[in-house]
Amino acid sequence: MKKSSLLYKIINGIWDMCYIWKTEMRNVFRDEGVLIFCILVPLGYPLLYSWIYNNEVVREVDTAIVDLSHSHSSREFIRDYDASPDAKATYYCNSLDEAKELVRRQAVHGILYFPADFDTKLNRGEQAHVGVYCDMSLMLTYKAIYQTSQAVASHINSGIQITQAGGFTDRDDEITTEPLAFDEVPIFNTTGGYGNAILPAVLVLILQQTMLLGIGMAAGTSRELNRNRELIPVSEHYGGIFRIVFGKALVYFMVYAVMGMYLTLVVPKLFSFVSMVTWTTILGFLLPYILSCVFFGLMLSCLVRYRENVMLLVVFTSVPLLFMTGVSWPLSNIPGFWQGFSWVFPSTFGIRGFLRISSMGASLADILPEFRALWIQTGVYFLATCLVFRQQLRSARLKADLTAEVAEEEEEAEEIVENR
């Protein structure tokens, strides 16, 4: 077969791609750091996180009370608050600083603060305020304290409304406080818990973040092992852009295809989360999501000079990315700039799409905007990766040529010296 023929070039390209795939796959399982981020973290971290929030709710959350009012109204509020199943008035403090110290020592998870003019404002018919301070290190305790405070405040407000309305019958009081009777029935998050609301989004985000960490760490290792400190080694197998990109991408796609099915199908079943996922839908959805994450990670890997750099680039972005998806923070309250910025990351559309699939039983047709966005990201990041790797390949070849020229000049100089 002639080397100039198209068939030979195709076969040679496939052979080189398989060689790159084999080399990259071997590095994934030999490099402890990459192995941890690509295999162990996706396997173990979702189990730990799901186990923490598997109870969905917590009871008797310790709370510090700072009552500067010392009035009947503040004592009524505290009594109703302490009678709730979710929260508990554990400590009574003389100042806010004393209560803050209890929070710092983790003796309590929140503070109720009643100002000195609390009862005075109520008696004047003015709006009074109760300060609620919550420790957000655990969302379950935050939810228990905040929602209990809201419920007690609403109950007391209803009593104030009845007093000011001046009704004559119980029916008048009912109409004053609840003019329209309704029953609240949760449709999708049937338990009303934190786990069913947030954890599906976290599972999808874990796929992206661990992949970026693994690809970045592998890129840092490649630079450290390369004599010229370049991402792509100078070798006959690394002679084309597409064979390099496809060879590397195939490794992470194969690994995370398994991890994706584990996170989206196995973990929710293990902890009895609401899951309406079907095999056909999730397979079709994970294909563009994993591909977009792979090419996004390969594109960013060119920025990694050392193994440790990827930690600085990726880890701190996890919480902001979760907020910008509109899951834990209303999308309507996110500024337009940050909404546009969130479209850069595959996790934004991946989380939104998966939540609809998991909680609402949506099909691919129902999440068509997110599905299209992921395919667009796949195409854009693939082209960007090819351009970036093309530049990296040129740089590697240029440095290799310069090194070879310098070596030849040194040999010639040594020969001249020896001849003299």
Go through the PLM ranges and name each one.
Residues 48-49, 91, 101, 254, ...:
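Membrane-spanning alpha-helical segments of multipass transporters and channels
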Residues 1-196, 391, 397-420:
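Extracytoplasmic/periplasmic domains immediately adjacent to an N-terminal transmembrane anchor
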Residues 53, 57, 220-228, 309, ...:
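Perimembrane helix-loop junctions in membrane proteins
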Residues 44-47, 185-268:
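Hydrophobic alpha-helical transmembrane segments of multi-pass membrane transport proteins
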Residues 28-35, 206, 247-253, 257, ...:
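Loop-to-transmembrane-helix entry motif
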Residues 73-77, 148, 215, 295, ...:
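Hydrophobic alpha-helical segments typical of transmembrane helices
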